[in-house]
Amino acid sequence: MAATRYNPKETEPKWRKRWDEAQAFRAVEAPGKRKYYVLEMFPYPSGRLHMGHVRNYALGDVIARYKRAQDFSVLHPMGWDAFGLPAENAAMERGVDPKAWTYDNIARMRAELKELGLSIDWSREFATCDVEYYGQQQALFLELFERGLVYRKESVVNWDPVDQTVLANEQVVDGKGWRSGAPVEKRKLAQWFLKITQYADQLVDDLKTLDRWPEKVRVMQENWIGRSKGARLRFRFAGQPPAGHEAGVEVYTTRPDTLFGASFVGVAPDHPLAQAVAAANPEAAAFIEKCRHGAVSEAEIETAEKEGFDTGLKVKHPFDPSWELPVWIANFILMDYGTGAIFGCPAHDQRDLDFARKYGLPVKPVVLPPEEAQAEAIVQKLLNEAYTGPGRIINSGFLDGLDVEAAKAAAIARIEEQGDGQGATVYRLRDWGVSRQRAWGCPIPVVHCQACGVVPVRRSDLPLTHPADIEFGKAGNALERHPTWKHTTCPGCGGPATRETDTLDTFVDSSWYFARFANPGAEAPIDKAAADYWLPVDQYIGGVEHAVLHLLYARFITKALADVGMLSVREPFAGLFTQGMVTHETYRKQSGEWVEPKEVEVTAEGKTRRARLVGSGEPVVIGDVEKMSKSKKNTVAPEEIFDVYGVDAARLFVLSDSPPERDAQWSTSGVQGAWRFVNRVWDEFDASEEPVPGTEEAVTGVATDNLRRQHAKTVKAVTEAIEGFRFNSAIAHLYSFLNVLKAERPQGRAGALAHAHRAALRDFALLIAPFTPHLAEECWARIGGQGLVVEAPWPTYDPALTQDAVKVLPVQVNGKRRGEISAPAGAEPAEVEQLVLADPEIKARLEGLTIRKIIVVKDRIVNIVAA
């Protein structure tokens, strides 16, 4: 038979059409059948796929195809996280309608995702900007509102005066808006919040049930929630207290054991006491204003230079009224953590130490490390670094001699006895601010009435949609500017009212979408029966950059919806996998301008690599390997790879290059290697011929036995590797087995070897299907496989064949290794003894000795006791 060349441009579309016609990936609720819900974090419709998308969705597709082959009822859906700022920016910059821009992008990306050959149930597709979706989200909002989980209050926010919107801390760079570059202002605005803090303990405690989540993600969430146990205590003023602060300064601390090491009390710039001081002191007011334009995120504040202002006020130490401490306003204290006030113990807190060194405040050690005998020994160490470890309390009166934990309890007991405070649990987690001053988002379904206050929209009036004639031509909230949309009547009294013009944070959109996929056409927000069948998501896949916010919000909303009876599960994602990024070398001209990889030719002479521009030959600087990004132009367009090598080669490369949790470095040589493998696979199947019927009982021979054993071992190894998310390892086993298939290819069509080879080829087609699905179908058809690979069961194997036929056993004489023998696997001790005594080398070692005992550990070792 003449060899045919594998042509992905013909093959891949053909099989995608066959899958569509067969509705091969439609999810079906099958009571009594095992279900499996695999979901990749849905994408923002930016307009084009990048290689990170290819890797992310290929990972999920491997799992979906594998589980389907194992006879699970599989749900593998796709949607679009479609609201958000980029669409409004496009509207302003290009004069396009954000809705049209978004749906055009969705159409392009949907076509690209379909080209990837993903086993997705497209009948469940939706975008969060679909009225059918965000209308149901508004119903959820009203449900939470009625349950007391939604409220509105004034809050200090980061305000971009150019874009005229609130910015998250992460969007403020060096005190400026990330997009506009304008200096950010601190403003008080009325904002909507969800009471996530009401679930703080559950969110921490339930992390221990998520044993299929990466430990690092669980730790990140635990730290973000920041549950800490300590004490609230009051420092009373020495002398006349400021008006309104007669009770003193309430401080929260996690280290009451270090109270005797206190050298100052600090308050946040936004603390009411700081505001009272600033009202009468222009210098204090100027310092506070400076703080407002400084670092905003906790991480930035942590690394920024510590600065303060001495208020001139003094407070009394709670354990010694004669001991007075100065009160400072400090830029590193957060108003929204604890009480917004601290006592500073420089010896045992690094921030306090940096502050004390700058302003000449005392540093008094009160915890002696276990390895130190004298307090004086640690004073020198405290010049630059605070001691925060365990130890024995010193210089602390009634606490002296106690260890740190015992001292904490004793200090809290004394504080409570004196009536100056009590033990307390505090969280870093704040309620979730969900207001956004943007029109391209989910409208918040409430109105403001002068007579009734805040009134929810009637459910019968949902969905509350955007006005058709909205204008996005300039910065700010287009809903606020609209001449008529915001004017309405109050659902309560029928009087005039105004609509809420803020929209919901897009994290709300992604906090429940996985539940909607259970039945996207349901009349209620969530079809509980369908959700009970499909949830939780068995395997969720996405980047670690979403470890905190998205995943935390989704966990919170799931618990809240369970409490209102909409869900039965309390955790949305049973398993979580965080994949690595796709990276590439960066290239720059001598001028510093970034250059795309396709414009560069790289040559190597020994270990020296040089790069030049294609065409001009201009030298190019080879930079670091970094995450693919448009800004550094080190991206590779997936369609360029698909056009040259086909989809399966691209999938194979991103899955085989490295373990999926690690970054994968893109290389042309790597994808070329994957393409060569695709062709080698096809060549093996193309060369195959149907064995002659009735010849399978012929003598097997060594080659046949070896092939059958390698076949069984490969099925076992690939299965275990997929189960363990070691996809690169699974592919490596397939590479090796292809070599075996080629080496053991029969010379004719008769005999056991021909039948064994044919059976191995059939299973090989099934084993490669999760990774290269189009190639698998073509190979399956080439050897006469019935139906589609996607409908075929996963291969099984005989465990006995995975054991080596022959075992090499070391032989010891009186405890020392003296040789080895080969014995059949599972051989009985008597048979092994005969082999040992017949071995010339062992016989020579035993010459002149009397054998007392031979001990055989089956398939492991032989011990001879001789004298």
Swiss-Prot record:
Designated gene of the protein: leuS
GO CC entries: cytosol
A molecular function GO annotation: ATP binding
Motif, 'HIGH' region: chain positions: 43-53
Reactions this protein catalyses: tRNA(Leu) + L-leucine + ATP = L-leucyl-tRNA(Leu) + AMP + diphosphate
'KMSKS' region (motif): residue ranges: 627-631
The protein, known as: Leucine--tRNA ligase
Sorted UniProt keywords: Aminoacyl-tRNA synthetase, ATP-binding, Cytoplasm, Ligase, Nucleotide-binding, Protein biosynthesis
InterPro entries for the chain: aa-tRNA-synth_I_CS (IPR001412), aa-tRNA-synth_Ia (IPR002300), Leu-tRNA-ligase (IPR002302), Leu_tRNA-synth_edit (IPR025709), M/V/L/I-tRNA-synth_anticd-bd (IPR013155), Methionyl/Leucyl_tRNA_Synth (IPR015413), Rossmann-like_a/b/a_fold (IPR014729), tRNAsynth_Ia_anticodon-bd (IPR009080)
UniProt-annotated binding residues for ATP: K630
Nucleotide-binding in keyword set: yes
Membership in a protein family: Belongs to the class-I aminoacyl-tRNA synthetase family.
EC annotation from Swiss-Prot or TrEMBL: 6.1.1.4
Alphabetical GO biological process terms: leucyl-tRNA aminoacylation
Pfam families: Anticodon_1 (PF08264), tRNA-synt_1 (PF00133), tRNA-synt_1_2 (PF13603), tRNA-synt_1g (PF09334)
